[in-house]
């Protein structure tokens, strides 16, 4: 196969493959490998950066040779027949943008390609997607459907209802639901604080509106120490803004703390969807609203479900308080490649520099009545959760691929409490038999009606 220079014009510049367009050019910065039969991301490839030290030479028009000049970096080369997606350019614009809207419904849609996020929703209330698919155009033989996330929700409220949807071939997560933390840079007066968007992809947003509630967070422990109400929002530039509070700043809150919008926090229902093989994870959810995830099929390359939240890197806020993960089918290739936060098939992985068990970040997560097809050890990873249930699930050994993950425990717990693991059914020689825990006591874990799992300090 060759690069079609009519569809994808390119040049070789300084021994680098560079794609060109009208008024722009962009060098190759990532390569994804897809199975030619299943169109799954090939296992244990993911964000493999070993190919980056390369020299490009044109063998003939459309045929480019990429060679490691030192013959050192690549320990694994793509097999003949592998489909390569050559990633270049930057996140451009969303295919569909929903902004400051109410009661929006999309249905019976297919998006074959977007140059950025598939559907971006911001500061909108009550959104319903039914029978919406972001998938490659099979008629053209494509495996790529989008540059970034599929459905991306930031700062929304009301109910997000997603049913009968599917995704495949995305270069990021099919669904991401979150808010945005911003840092307090300066206390200007008892009622005025100067804040900053710490992630450049958040810059330019309207962080909040009058009468919306604010949480004040100590970023090392991610503990919400106080709340307040916003009276006025004033943008200074794309990155910085001033918030006027309706009452004096709570005692102890100072520069370096972060703020979270507690009003723009939706409920979410995600049912009967197919999370096909995409780069990275399947479903990311960070909202304190009620969340139901049920009757879905997951075939993600990384973790199927990520529950994160942080004020230290991505600044995506939303400590969960009520999450039900029920009757889903987690299939290969779930967690078959390593990406950020992919600690297990289900990864509850908030970025907390110093997690303290007495200040849990997430609460009330139930993982029940699901089926896991497992070729590797890690099933569940959880940090800083109060009230975690893993019960009545069916765990089935799958030998489609060899174990590779650095974690060798089935369940890993850190700074959690009130954990229940019970009545899980085992089929075959499932590998992850141990429960590893840290920053917590053995008595914080209750294992019953199942001799399979055993505790390991």
Language-model features, listed with the residues they occupy:
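Eukaryotic tandem repeat interaction scaffolds
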Residues: 320-322, 329-338, 342-346, 351, ...
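Acidic, glycine- and Ser/Thr-rich low-complexity intrinsically disordered tracts
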Residues: 3, 9-12, 22-23, 51, ...
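Short glycine/acidic-rich loop motifs that flank beta-strands on beta-rich extracellular proteins
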Residues: 93-94, 115-120, 137-149, 171-177, ...
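Solenoid scaffold repeats with emphasis on beta-solenoid/beta-helix
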Residues: 96-99, 103-104, 109, 122, ...
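Short, recurring structural edge motifs at helix starts
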Residues: 92-95, 149-152, 257-260, 280-282, ...
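Extracellular polysaccharide-degrading/modifying enzymes targeting complex plant/algal/animal polysaccharides
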Residues: 1-112, 120, 136-144, 168-169, ...
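Long amphipathic alpha-helical scaffold regions
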Residues: 124-159, 188-202, 295-334, 395-420, ...
């Amino acid at each position: 196969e060759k690069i079609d220079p009519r569809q994808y014009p390119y040049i070789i510049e300084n021994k680098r493959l560079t794609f060109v367009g009208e008024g722009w050019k962009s060098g190759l910065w990532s390569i994804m490998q897809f199975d030619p039969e299943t169109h799954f991301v090939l296992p244990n490839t993911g964000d493999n950066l070993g190919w980056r030290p390369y020299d490009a030479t044109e063998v003939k028009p459309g045929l480019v040779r990429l060679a490691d000049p030192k013959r050192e970096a690549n320990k694994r080369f793509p097999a003949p027949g592998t489909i390569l997606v050559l990633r270049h350019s930057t996140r451009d614009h969303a295919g569909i943008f929903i902004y400051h809207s109410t009661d929006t419904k999309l249905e019976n849609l297919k998006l074959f390609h977007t140059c950025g996020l598939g559907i971006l929703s911001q500061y909108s209330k009550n959104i319903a997607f039914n029978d919406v698919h972001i998938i490659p155009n099979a008629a053209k033989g494509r495996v790529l459907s989008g540059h970034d996330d599929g459905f991306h929700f930031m700062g929304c409220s009301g109910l997000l209802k997603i049913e009968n949807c599917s995704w495949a071939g995305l270069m990021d997560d099919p669904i991401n639901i979150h808010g945005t933390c911003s840092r307090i840079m300066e206390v200007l007066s008892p009622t005025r604080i100067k804040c900053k968007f710490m992630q450049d992809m958040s810059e330019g947003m309207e962080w909040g509106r009058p009468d919306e509630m604010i949480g004040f967070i100590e970023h090392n422990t991610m503990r919400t120490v106080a709340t307040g109400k916003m009276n006025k929002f004033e943008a200074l530039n794309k990155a910085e803004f001033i918030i006027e509070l309706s009452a004096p700043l709570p005692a102890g809150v100072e520069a370096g703390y972060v703020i979270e919008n507690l009003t723009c926090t939706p409920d979410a229902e995600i049912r009967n969807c197919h999370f096909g093989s995409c780069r990275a994870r399947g479903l990311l959810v960070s909202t304190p609203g009620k969340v139901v995830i049920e009757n879905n099929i997951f075939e993600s390359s990384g973790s199927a479900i990520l529950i994160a939240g942080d004020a230290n890197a991505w600044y995506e806020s939303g400590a969960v308080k009520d999450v039900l993960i029920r009757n889903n089918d987690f299939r290969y290739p779930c967690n078959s490649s390593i990406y950020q936060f992919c600690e297990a098939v289900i990864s509850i992985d908030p970025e907390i520099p110093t997690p303290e068990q007495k200040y849990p970040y997430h609460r009330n997560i139930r993982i029940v009545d699901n089926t896991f097809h497992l070729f590797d050890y890690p099933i569940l990873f959880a940090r800083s959760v109060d009230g975690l249930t893993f019960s009545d699930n069916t765990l089935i050994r799958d030998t489609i691929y060899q174990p590779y993950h650095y974690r060798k425990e089935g369940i890993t717990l850190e700074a959690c409490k009130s954990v229940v693991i019970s009545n899980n059914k085992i089929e075959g020689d499932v590998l992850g038999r141990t429960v590893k825990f840290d920053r917590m006591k053995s008595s914080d874990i209750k294992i019953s009606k199942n001799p399979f799992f055993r505790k390991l300090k």
